[in-house]
Amino acid sequence: MGDWSFLGRLLENAQEHSTVIGKVWLTVLFIFRILVLGAAAEDVWGDEQSDFTCNTQQPGCENVCYDRAFPISHIRFWALQIIFVSTPTLIYLGHVLHIVRMEEKKKEREEEEQLKRESPSPKEPPQDNPSSRDDRGRVRMAGALLRTYVFNIIFKTLFEVGFIAGQYFLYGFELKPLYRCDRWPCPNTVDCFISRPTEKTIFIIFMLAVACASLLLNMLEIYHLGWKKLKQGVTSRLGPDASEAPLGTADPPPLPPSSRPPAVAIGFPPYYAHTAAPLGQARAVGYPGAPPPAADFKLLALTEARGKGQSAKLYNGHHHLLMTEQNWANQAAERQPPALKAYPAASTPAAPSPVGSSSPPLAHEAEAGAAPLLLDGSGSSLEGSALAGTPEEEEQAVTTAAQMHQPPLPLGDPGRASKASRASSGRARPEDLAI
């Protein structure tokens, strides 16, 4: 057959821009197909028509039987197989050469532009396109070039499968020495004989094995490219995170918890109660933030009562008891002789009260533990609104106070006593404090 050197040179150029499996495939194509076909197969099939004989004298019967036995010669069939299988690789090579030529033109334009400049920089090397060249100077297989290479492999695989199937349906994988032919113009079924059938069968099996090996290499290359691209895709997604966080580095320390402002406990304002000041002294009312007065005040902590109703009831009773004691103290002050009234009001002793009447208020105060409030002689509206009880409870508290504090027998005018009693129920009048 013809010279295969031109095709070999083209495929050799394509081998430089192929993968490892692609280079192996081209090696198999060169050695086990082109060389075997050109060196041995032509000699084996060179005399196949001249040595094909039939037991008939009918003119044309032998040629018709040969055409039916071998629709296409094995040599020409394998030559077509090599050409068809190599065509996708040649197309890929044309794409590579196109890219190389475009790069050369680009370099030439850059050199021309550099020469046209007023101050050229000869030391500046021409910059290559990083997307088309790798670190070894070869054309990078990416983008459109990669798609061309993948289509190259797919079409090679399809051609291999097609030619293997065609060989099976045309010849089968074995040549028999005897071939029976009944085709016209043969008068009857004639026997035809094939020369060197065993040798030809060996070559058929060998070429079939080479075709299967090429098909397997194509499938491996598809798997290799698919796995490589899948790995690159995963690496491109996870690569930046892995590069920023090298191995062996500890996790960053957790952020400190957000500092919250300290909880401000809002309590009730303190209340100051007078400790039984004498009648002549003015009563001072405490309020939050005010400086303490000169009189003796006692700061009582605000505690929660066990029962609201019980504490209010007991405190109402205690309040009325204190009012009753103050009334008796006013009466005693009025009965004092003029010599004793000349003394300061601060030296006036505490109001006399029976022994039995002083202990119950203290006992009630310790037992109830009610919230202390500011006590004055007149009873403020705050006390009345916060600790006001039902009329029955107030009546019971007043009755208890009357039972515990029996008034002494009047020594003077009973009218004055009733008059002082009416005056003590309200605010102190100026005539009560007159000396």
From Swiss-Prot:
Q: What is the effect of changing R76G?
A: In CTRCT14; nearly abolishes formation of gap junctions; no significant effect on formation of functional hemichannels
Main subcellular location: membrane
Q: Where is this region: Disordered?
A: 108-136, 332-435
Q: What highest taxon heads this organism's lineage?
A: Eukaryota
Which sequence ranges are listed under topological domain Cytoplasmic?
16-19, 93-152, 223-435
Q: Where is the composition biased (Basic and acidic residues)?
A: 108-121
Concerning PROSITE patterns, the annotation shows: CONNEXINS_1, CONNEXINS_2
The consequence of T87M is: In CTRCT14; pearl box cataract
- Functional summary from the UniProt entry: Structural component of lens fiber gap junctions. Gap junctions are dodecameric channels that connect the cytoplasm of adjoining cells. They are formed by the docking of two hexameric hemichannels, one from each cell membrane. Small molecules and ions diffuse from one cell to a neighboring cell via the central pore.
What name does UniProt use for this protein? Answer: Gap junction alpha-3 protein
Organism, by scientific name, is: Homo sapiens
